C-alpha cells in the first residue's frame, strides 16, 4: 500500500481581517456564480516552496508573519472570510461577511519526502490528501444554509520545504482569483505592511 504521508497538526487558528476595518457586508451572486453553487466540488490547490530551516524556526519566525499578512490581505478579499448564506428571508443566496468572520488556518508538520511530492513526475494522488484542509461549518450566521468559503493549511517539511494547501468554494473563487489572492498574500508578507492597491502591486 502506498505511503499516504500523514501530517502532525501543530496549530489551528482563525484569521480575520483587521478588527473594525470593514463592518458587515453583503455581496449578491452574479448569474455566472449560480452554476457553481454546492454540491459542486471544492477548488483544491497546493503551492510548494523550498525552505531549508527547522520547524522551530518556521513556527516562531515565519508563521506569525504569515498570520499577520493573511489578516491584512483578507481586508481586500473579505468575501473569502465570510459565508455563502441562504435563509428563509432571502430570495436567493448571497455572500455575507459579518465583522469578525474568519478563515481557518492550520499549521502542520510532515516527515514526508518534500522533493518527491513537489517533483515533476508521476505521483500517487493519495499522498496529497493530507496537505489540503477541509472546510467546516460555522455557527456565526444562519445555520439554514451557511457555507464557509476558504480554508488554508501550511505544512512544513523541516529543512526541506513548505506546502500551502488551499480548499475553497468554487462559487467564490476560481483558479485566476486564487492565484491573485496568493500573490497578494505573498506581497503583503514580503513587505510587512498592507502596501496594496492590488492591481498595481502584484506582478
Regions of interest found by a model, annotated:
Residues 1-203:
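Non-catalytic N-terminal regions of enzymes
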Amino acid at each position: 500500500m502506498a505511503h499516504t504521508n500523514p501530517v502532525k497538526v501543530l496549530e489551528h487558528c482563525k484569521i480575520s481581517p483587521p478588527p473594525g476595518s470593514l463592518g458587515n457586508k453583503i455581496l449578491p451572486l452574479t448569474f455566472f456564480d449560480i452554476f457553481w453553487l454546492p454540491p459542486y466540488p471544492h477548488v483544491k490547490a497546493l503551492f510548494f516552496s523550498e525552505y531549508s530551516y527547522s520547524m522551530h524556526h518556521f513556527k516562531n519566525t515565519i508563521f506569525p508573519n504569515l498570520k499577520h499578512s493573511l489578516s491584512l490581505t483578507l481586508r481586500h478579499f473579505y468575501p473569502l472570510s465570510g459565508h455563502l448564506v441562504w435563509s428563509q428571508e432571502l430570495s436567493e443566496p448571497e455572500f455575507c461577511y459579518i465583522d469578525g468572520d474568519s478563515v481557518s488556518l492550520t499549521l502542520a508538520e510532515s516527515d514526508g519526502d518534500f522533493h518527491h511530492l513537489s517533483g515533476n513526475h508521476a505521483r500517487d494522488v493519495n499522498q496529497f490528501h493530507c496537505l489540503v484542509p477541509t472546510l467546516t461549518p460555522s455557527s456565526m450566521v444562519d445555520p439554514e444554509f451557511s457555507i464557509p468559503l476558504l480554508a488554508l493549511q501550511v505544512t512544513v517539511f523541516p529543512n526541506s520545504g513548505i506546502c500551502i494547501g488551499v480548499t475553497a468554494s468554487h462559487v467564490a473563487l476560481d483558479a485566476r482569483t486564487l492565484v491573485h489572492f496568493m500573490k497578494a498574500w505573498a506581497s503583503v508578507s514580503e513587505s510587512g505592511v498592507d502596501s496594496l492597491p492590488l492591481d498595481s502591486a502584484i506582478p
